[in-house]
């Protein structure tokens, strides 16, 4: 644990000033980020990776942007564990770099967006404790890309119980909600944490008047729609049909979906209503009464979201959106690699692994 703390080093300050609108360095930051995006793995890499074993895949990423992460962690980990830690470390350091190279309002928006990783980490810590995961297993899934440092999260992971973790977070905005966690209501807590995150993010965006903030808001609202739509499918397929059971699980602020109307519809009518939305073309080929797994549906919607963020990043190139687009695609790359490593490690067929990937 101490080794990782030393390797990851100190996080840059996440304090930013939204009032410093004149000091934003959009042109410089976007130029840097476009260069970073050009180094993401090309889509042609994934068929090759699917034909490799774990050691070969590790060597492959060791020759890419993940080289330093793999090299520095190889003394402590191997196989899928090495990959997991290296991917998470790389994400954290990459996003910290974005915080360092941005300033003013641009920095403020990026910091607000990256707080999603604090939510991820709180969920991971709570889930780990109630399922009696080892400290190492918990650390493997933490991503120090938000405001929480890796050192502070390591200390939380070492706590004996979830109650101790909750108490250690008493000075955060999440504490009033976390006090309601009793060890049996994790799904409720996780959903409410997501709501807090998006409410805070929309507050940071404010009432979007500039083209920059309007585009930023559009990407976030599109993501909310995708999350709600996946959740609606999951609930409908599970036989949950009552709006009063569905609505508390929805996130406010979506772009197009009329959630209250969709929540009240039986499955067939729900699907028919979706044909009027922008999302239908992306999912029409996999939606049907006999649909059992939602994996392909989720992949299609995620792909649509990624493609849309890229399109919006070209609408106004010198804005926050190209940086947001890079964050989204970088996370998707890490997710794809994680799926491949874990799939290979557990013996899944290449076809099953491929179904879970979102390749752009």
Swiss-Prot record:
One of its GO terms (molecular function) is ATP binding. Pfam families: vATP-synt_AC39 (PF01992). InterPro entries: ATPase_csu/dsu_sf (IPR036079), ATPase_V0-cplx_csu (IPR014272), ATPase_V0-cplx_csu/dsu (IPR002843), V-ATPase_V0D/AC39_subunit (IPR050873), V-type_ATPase_csu/dsu (IPR035067), V-type_ATPase_csu/dsu_dom_3 (IPR044911). One of its GO terms (cellular component) is plasma membrane. It is a peripheral membrane protein. The keyword Cell membrane applies. It is found in: Cell membrane. Coiled coil: none annotated. Keywords: ATP synthesis, Cell membrane, Hydrogen ion transport, Ion transport, Membrane, Transport. Belongs to the V-ATPase V0D/AC39 subunit family. Has multiple subunits, A(3), B(3), C, D, E, F, G, I and K(x); there may be a few other subunits as well. This organism has both a Na(+)-translocating F1F0 ATP synthase and this H(+)-translocating A1A0 ATP synthase. NCBIfam families: AhaC (TIGR02923), PRK01198.1-4 (NF002268). This is A-type ATP synthase subunit C. The gene is atpC.
């Amino acid at each position: 644990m101490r080794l990782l703390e030393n390797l990851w080093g100190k996080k840059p300050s996440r304090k930013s000033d939204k009032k410093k609108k004149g000091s934003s360095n959009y042109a410089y930051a976007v130029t840097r980020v476009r260069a970073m995006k050009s180094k993401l793995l090309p889509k042609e890499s994934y068929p090759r990776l699917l034909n490799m074993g774990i050691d070969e895949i590790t060597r492959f990423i060791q020759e890419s942007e993940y080289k330093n992460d793999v090299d520095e962690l190889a003394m402590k980990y191997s196989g899928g564990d090495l990959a997991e830690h290296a991917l998470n470390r790389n994400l954290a350091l990459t996003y910290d770099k974005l915080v360092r190279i941005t300033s003013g309002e641009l920095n403020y928006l990026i910091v607000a967006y990256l707080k999603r990783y604090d939510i991820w980490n709180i969920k991971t810590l709570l889930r780990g404790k109630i399922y009696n995961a080892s400290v190492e297993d918990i650390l493997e899934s933490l991503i120090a890309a938000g405001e929480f440092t890796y050192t502070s999260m390591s200390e939380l992971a070492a706590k004996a119980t979830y109650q101790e973790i909750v108490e250690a977070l008493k000075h955060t905005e999440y504490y009033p909600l976390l006090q309601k966690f009793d060890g049996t209501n994790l799904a409720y807590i996780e959903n409410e944490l997501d709501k807090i995150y998006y409410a805070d993010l929309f507050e940071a965006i404010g009432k979007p008047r500039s083209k920059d903030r309007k585009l930023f808001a559009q990407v976030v609202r599109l993501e909310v729609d995708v999350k709600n739509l996946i959740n609606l499918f999951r609930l409908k397929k599970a036989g949950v049909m009552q709006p009063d059971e569905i609505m508390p699980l929805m996130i406010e602020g979506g772009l197009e979906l009329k959630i209250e109307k969709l929540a009240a519809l039986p499955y067939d009518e729900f699907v028919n209503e979706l044909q009027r939305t922008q999302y239908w073309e992306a999912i029409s080929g996999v939606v049907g009464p006999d649909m059992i797994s939602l994996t392909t549906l989720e992949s299609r919607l995620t792909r649509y979201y990624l493609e849309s963020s890229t399109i919006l990043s070209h609408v106004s190139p010198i804005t926050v959106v190209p940086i947001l687009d890079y964050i989204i695609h970088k996370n998707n790359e890490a997710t794809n690699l994680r799926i491949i490593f874990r799939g290979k490690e557990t013996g899944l067929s290449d076809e099953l692994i491929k179904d879970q990937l979102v390749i752009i």
